[in-house]
Structures are given as structure tokens and as C-alpha cells.
């Protein structure tokens, strides 16, 4: 029995399913989840001392690679001054100033402790600002696990094979309208009918929770136009895409300014952090300035601010994101070449330093239906074959992959060598 198998058996005694987030259980790919004990650079090391090139990156935050010395040093320095104060700190203001200088649409920002908390708070704020109740989201897009958002969600819920979650009251769900991703005509039709009741549209500008589906040409532009027309708040959920697709996030890359944005993952440098922000007029409705209440004991935690500030400063250097995107493109080109050579139907998607892998004969992946038509069973086999070759992919056919600046030519070769063997075995 491996150490991971023994630890998983032990974990199931007191942790539901043996994990603290469902996708980690390997339910969609089969087998025993790996338990990791160390991570450094582009690698993770499991409890049996096997090293893997890591394309999960803690589900996105580790854009610098694991254990970047500058980030670790900043956290160590803060440790000497205490873990949490429950009071304002200078670092919170520095973080707010930096985020607002980087992200095109941000005029004010509020720190929270997770991406779920950020999206939940942004929606509450949009409702308070507009005085409307309904929200629009898109099929297969995941915005955290708050009740009103677990309606035809993506990510872990796709992995489980269910469209929603038990325990969500019908009264919550009735205010959530779900439309097809990348279908602006559906948005136009819905807003023409009920636009006066809709507080906000929330969207992943790149859908990263049904693997990785970039926006179709004109989709984000159409959302901006329709929200302006109907007085609807446009929220970009940039928890995944923020600071990764480009320094300014997806909104910086695609040139579309939302009214509100939510962030997580990279903004905390690996610590539990989220934030939301946007137009000053809307943010002025949040307490203590306005009537929309939001609070958090650990919001703006000094350890998290130290890690996040250091990370954002490091990734702001000229050329950083061009290097990341280039590595990602070279890796995906190499995978496609090897799949084609093996005669395996395979297509990749990319948005900067995030990517999707699909076993599909489609020319491109644009819709939720395209995602669901891909061969998840073949992905299961591929996942385990890549593990055997020393490459750790997300343990789900519906999760995006992530690269880091620590990935280089050596890691690329390991990845492509493993993939060549895997594709040959999948014929």
C-alpha cells in the first residue's frame, strides 16, 4: 500500500470523502488521490517521494511556481510581527493601490478571504445598488459555492455529474437565470423580456470551470453593450483569469471594462485571499459607506497581504506574461502534434497561461455542449498515463490547467515525452 493510499484511508474516518474540496478525491478520474508533502518551483512531491511536473498550481495561485523565495521571505518577515490584528494595516492600502493601478476597471477594492466570498459579496452589492433581485449567470460557469450560484454550475459540479447542489432552496434558485455561455443572442432576448428585474450578469470572461473556454468574438463586447442598455451591473469573475491571462486580467487582455470584478488565487500569492471592486459609484454602497453589509474577521490578513503584494510586484515586470504565454503555447503545440501523430482526436484551448485539454474531434471548443461532448473516459486514462510519466494534471476533464514562470525547457520535455507515450497507449 502506498503512503497516499494509507493516508486516504485514514482521512476518510473524520473528513467527508477524505478531502476538503470534492475534486481532490479523484472521483472523476478514478484511483486514489495523491497526498503531497512538498512543492518547489514547477514540481510537487507526493508522500511516496515521487516528483511531478505540476500543471495544477494549487488550482491557479502559483503563477511564480511553488515556494518562490521572495514570497516566502515576505511571509516570514510578517510572521515576526503577528498573524492577524483585526484592524487596518498599511499593507491593505498598498494592496488596494496596487490592484487599482493594475486592473483597468478598478476604482475601489474590498479585500475578503476567498473567491466565493468575493463573488457572493459582489452580487449582494449589485442587488443593493440596483434594487433588483435577479441575476444572470452562464451554463457551466462556476462562481463559488454560495447558494444562488450553484445552479447549472461548472467545475466540481460537472465532475460529479449533477447540474446543481442539494440544499439550495428553490426560492434562492428562482432568482438565478442561466443562459448558454458564448451566446449573446440569448442574453439579448432575456434582457429584452426581463431586463428590468436583473441586477447583474456575472461571467467568467474565460470559462475556467468547464476546462478552459475563451470568449467567442463579440461575446464580452455584447455583454457590455446589453448591460449598459438595461442598467444591469456587469461582473467579471476573474478569480482564475485575474493577473494570469494578462497582468490586467482578462479585461485587460480583451479590452472590456466590467462594472465590478472579483479576484482570488494569485492576488493572495498562495494564501486564502479574495477581493472585489470596481466603479466608485457602486463600491460606495458597501458598508461602512452605504447600506450593503459585508464584513470578515480575516479580511486583509497581514500574512496574506504580504504574500499577495510580493507576488503582484514580481509578476508586474516587463515580459513576464509574454514568457508565460509562450511556454503555454509551445506545450500545447507539442501536445497537439503528438496527438495528431498518434491519430488521437484531441484539441486544446488557451488563454494566456491557462489552458484546456479535450479529447474531441471538434475544430474548436466554444460552448457548454462542446465541452460535454468531449471524451471524459479517454481523459481518465490520459490523466493516469501522464501521472506515470511524472506529470500532474488537474484530476478532472472539466478543470483548466495552469503554467507558471518556473516551467521551462526541462519541464516541457518531460511533459511532451510523457504525452507521446500516453497518446500511443490511447490509440
From Swiss-Prot:
GO process annotations (BP): protoporphyrinogen IX biosynthetic process
Broad class of the protein's primary localization: cytoplasm
Matches recorded under CDD domains: OAT_like
GO molecular function: glutamate-1-semialdehyde 2,1-aminomutase activity; pyridoxal phosphate binding; transaminase activity
N6-(pyridoxal phosphate)lysine carried by residues: 265
GO cellular component: cytoplasm
Pfam families the UniProt entry points to: Aminotran_3
EC id: 5.4.3.8
PROSITE patterns: AA_TRANSFER_CLASS_3
Keyword field: Cytoplasm, Isomerase, Porphyrin biosynthesis, Pyridoxal phosphate
Disulphide-bridged cysteine pairs: none
Enzyme class, broadest EC rank: isomerase
SUPFAM superfamilies: PLP-dependent transferases
Pathway info: Porphyrin-containing compound metabolism; protoporphyrin-IX biosynthesis; 5-aminolevulinate from L-glutamyl-tRNA(Glu): step 2/2
Catalysed reactions, semicolon-separated: (S)-4-amino-5-oxopentanoate = 5-aminolevulinate
Cofactor field: pyridoxal 5'-phosphate
Recorded superkingdom: Bacteria
Cellular localisation: Cytoplasm
Family: Belongs to the class-III pyridoxal-phosphate-dependent aminotransferase family. HemL subfamily.
Oligomeric and partner information: Homodimer.
Protein name: Glutamate-1-semialdehyde 2,1-aminomutase
Name of the gene this protein is made from: hemL
